[in-house]
Amino acid sequence: MAKAKFERTKPHVNIGTIGHVDHGKTTLTAAITKYFGEFKAYDQIDGAPEERARGITISTAHVEYESENRHYAHVDCPGHADYVKNMITGAAQMDGAILVVNAADGPMPQTREHILLGRQVGIPYMVVYLNKVDQVDDPELLELVEMEVRELLSSYDYPGDDIPIVKGSALAALEGRDAEIGENSIRELMKAVDDYIPTPERAVDLPFLMPIEDVFSISGRGTVVTGRVERGAVNVGDELEIVGIRPTKKTTCTGVEMFRKLLDRGEAGDNIGALLRGVERDGVERGQVLAKPGSVTPHTEFEAEAYILTKEEGGRHTPFFANYRPQFYFRTTDVTGTVKLPEGTEMVMPGDNLKFEVELIAPIAMEEKLRFAIREGGRTVGAGVVSKILK
């Protein structure tokens, strides 16, 4: 059978299921595909293949489905460690998440951890599915659990009072019984996701930014920098800034090339060469970014959420301590930095995830949600995301 082609006419949104182990994330994912996509059985989702992101192996299942209004790409991870790695590396960017909570248990440790991670890595919106409601006989108990979930969300700066909470049974939906808590709850959930999680801005509509990968000098023309446009678009004649590592410098783009052809513009996703006016060959280097003036600023100190690889994943064999000095790989280059551990943390073991502060020896064009790798001599030993800029 030929693969059905998804019509790209609908706006696209990336979401995923998060929550405590065994609260029903994968069952819910399977149930959604039953009513809105190409049906995937529990085992097909649970046996997620391993993939690599920033040198880290993660198991993630990807499913696609569509509501009346939108097309969704949905991620589900088999294990808790996979969630942590996935959220920190941004291997699967999420525009919003469905938090699954077992109504009989209420919020559990990983429920809390996933909400905290969501806040740290910048998942902007959450919708709650209160699962297994058929295991709770007392409606007052159900109300208490709902209140508890709302308070927990609010304590991590999510608007707990406004977040939609849908009650149901993913298993009933998957087995096609008890429509009230089964199929109807899935339809209600997707309506909540449609209405509450906004369509993200397209990358091409954001301010222009291109990490510089290489620099060439073309005799008689000037200096060309190459790279893949991360977001936005650049037109010939645009004023730009070169940001990071050295003092910020203004320039003008006098030409855009792609595959040796001259273009009027380059946009998100394109690999381009940009010809820059008045910039010497040694006045710009890999690791800087080319950006719309004022849209991004250079920083040296930030707070990060990071995951440290285990020995089995090719990471360190030993813990590290305060004032650890690895390299931080941002976009296209390594910059050395010093780690400041949170109070009460003496050492960090391989396999840990934690929040810490970093001071870099040179400024990098940076904003919240920017991902990086932690490296020692070119070997990846961890992954992180900027959760807050300090200086």
UniProtKB/Swiss-Prot annotation:
Residues 10-201 form the tr-type G domain. The keyword Metal-binding applies. It is found in: Cytoplasm. Residues 131-134 are annotated as: G4. GO terms for molecular function: GTP binding; GTPase activity; guanosine tetraphosphate binding; translation elongation factor activity. Keywords: Cytoplasm, Elongation factor, GTP-binding, Hydrolase, Magnesium, Metal-binding, Nucleotide-binding, Protein biosynthesis. It holds the Pfam family GTP_EFTU. SUPFAM superfamilies: EF-Tu/eEF-1alpha/eIF2-gamma C-terminal domain, P-loop containing nucleoside triphosphate hydrolases, Translation proteins. Residues 169-171 are annotated as: G5. Residues 76-79 are annotated as: G3. It is an enzyme of class 3 (hydrolase). GTP binds at residues 19-26, 76-80, 131-134. GO terms for cellular component: cytosol. Residues 19-26 are annotated as: G1. Its EC number is 3.6.5.3. InterPro entries: EF-Tu_GTP-bd (IPR041709), EF-Tu_GTPase (IPR050055), EFTu-like_2 (IPR004161), EFTU_2 (IPR033720), G_TR_CS (IPR031157), P-loop_NTPase (IPR027417), Small_GTP-bd (IPR005225), T_Tr_GTP-bd_dom (IPR000795). Mg(2+) binds at residue 26. It catalyses: GTP + H2O = GDP + phosphate + H(+). Residues 55-59 are annotated as: G2. PANTHER family: ELONGATION FACTOR TU, MITOCHONDRIAL (PTHR43721:SF22), ELONGATION FACTOR TU-RELATED (PTHR43721). Monomer. GTP hydrolase that promotes the GTP-dependent binding of aminoacyl-tRNA to the A-site of ribosomes during protein biosynthesis. Belongs to the TRAFAC class translation factor GTPase superfamily. Classic translation factor GTPase family. EF-Tu/EF-1A subfamily. This is Elongation factor Tu. It comes from Paracoccus denitrificans (strain Pd 1222).
